[in-house]
Design a protein with these regions (language model features):
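N-terminal strand-loop element at the rim of the active site
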Residues: 2, 8-15, 22-73, 81-82
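Active-site proximal beta-strand in glycosyltransferases
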Residues: 4, 90-92, 97, 103-123, ...
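Short, flexible loop segments at the rims of nucleotide/cofactor-binding pockets, characterized by
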Residues: 14, 66-71, 92-93, 119-125
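Carbohydrate-associated surface elements
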Residues: 42, 149, 168
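An amphipathic, basic-hydrophobic alpha-helix
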Residues: 61-90, 100, 128-135
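Membrane-proximal helix-turn-helix segments that form the acceptor-binding/catalytic region
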Residues: 121-145, 150-152, 157
């Protein structure tokens, strides 16, 4: 049995593909006996008892859509506290270079860290934050992409080896 922190930069109380993947994966890992905590922004009551809310999100324009992010200092402090309060064996970051809880967790490097990349197509964020993102990505123990196009985007800007593990 592993103690796993699953960290999302997106509010898990707002519907979205990454949020659904985070909650679904957490449920499945718990079903097979792992202890999983989801650390994420949450607008309102947590959707599951295993979610540690990190504060409210701010609608943020990104890559042609609006993402519910929490890139503020209070969310960072809650992330630090949550990760320090529990001794996790693995930290799994979804969208590890998106500003907010995932970057905070990556900088702490308290356990082996898996980064799952979901974004595909092209990304202004990857282009603009290239040097910082590349530096942050170097701190990942394992890099995962959810599709070939997500792998192409991440490897274009961040280099490294990626394993494709499809959603679901």
């Amino acid at each position: 049995m592993l103690r796993i922190a699953m960290v999302s930069p997106y509010s898990v109380s707002v519907p979205g593909g990454v949020q659904a993947q985070v909650l679904g994966l957490a449920r499945e890992l718990r079903r097979v006996g792992h202890e999983v905590r989801v650390l994420a922004p949450c607008d309102g009551p947590p959707p599951e008892p295993f979610v540690t809310p990190l504060g409210n999100s701010l609608p943020t324009a990104a890559n042609g859509s609006v993402a519910p992010l929490a890139p503020d200092p209070s969310a960072a402090l809650r992330t630090i506290r949550a990760l320090n309060d529990e001794a996790f064996d693995v930290i799994h970051l979804h969208e590890p270079i998106v500003p907010g809880p995932t970057v905070t967790a990556l900088l702490l490097k308290l356990a082996p860290t898996v980064g799952t990349f979901h974004a595909a197509g092209d990304s202004t964020s990857y282009r603009v934050l290239n040097k910082t993102a590349r530096w942050a990505a170097e701190h990942l123990s394992v890099r995962v992409a959810v599709s070939e196009s997500a792998k192409e985007l991440a490897s274009k800007y961040l280099d490294g080896e990626y394993t494709i593990l499809f959603n679901g």
